[in-house]
């Protein structure tokens, strides 16, 4: 063996099977747009969502803002309160569906009438949770939608 001080190392120009090896990249967090007209509700929901591998990429205080931010950011999941000023969640979802036809939408509301659930489904909702179940069921609903499943709890 030669003198280590005199040896040089040059990277090989021959490709090897290890050249393409890359460790598994961490899975990307779910980017969520959250719309509710009550700031305290948004703060609470953001806190809950951030405990998962979920990034709240935007918040909206009404349906009109939700439509604008959805168009701008193309989130992975949209969570909408049904009842908001300016433009409600149902109407916002109808507009969002025009340019994001496949993004999962999760609605929540104080009301859980069969008619409201049917309307939510008709505009393409993949999930619905009543507000009185949000603390217990929101993360379960988000996980279901992340896995391309539906979640209706009422």
Q: Each predicted region: which residue ranges?
A:
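Short amphipathic alpha-helix used as the core "switch/output" element in two-component signaling
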Residues: 68, 90-101
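Receiver (REC) domain active-site loop signature in two-component systems and cognate sites
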Residues: 84
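Active-site beta3 strand of CheY-like receiver
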Residues: 73-79
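Acidic catalytic/metal-coordinating carboxylates
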Residues: 62-65, 87-91
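Active-site residues of response regulator receiver
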Residues: 81, 109
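Non-catalytic signal-transmission and effector/linker regions of two-component phosphorelay proteins
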Residues: 1-31, 139-147, 152-154
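Two-component/phosphorelay signaling modules centered on CheY-like receiver
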Residues: 39-58
């Amino acid at each position: 063996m030669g003198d280590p001080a005199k040896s040089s190392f040059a990277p090989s120009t021959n490709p090897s099977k290890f050249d393409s090896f890359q460790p598994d990249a961490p899975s990307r967090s779910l980017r969520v747009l959250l719309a509710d007209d009550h700031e305290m509700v948004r703060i609470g929901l953001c806190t809950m969502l951030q405990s998962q591998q979920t990034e709240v990429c935007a918040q909206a205080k009404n349906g009109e803002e939700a439509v604008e931010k959805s168009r701008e950011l193309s989130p992975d999941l949209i969570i909408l309160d049904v009842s908001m000023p300016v433009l409600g969640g149902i109407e916002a979802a109808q507009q969002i569906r025009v340019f994001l036809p496949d993004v999962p939408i999760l609605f929540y509301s104080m009301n859980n009438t069969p008619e409201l659930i049917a309307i939510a489904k008709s505009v393409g909702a993949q999930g619905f949770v009543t507000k009185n179940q949000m603390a217990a069921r929101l993360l379960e609903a988000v996980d279901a939608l992340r896995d391309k499943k539906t979640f209706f709890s009422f």
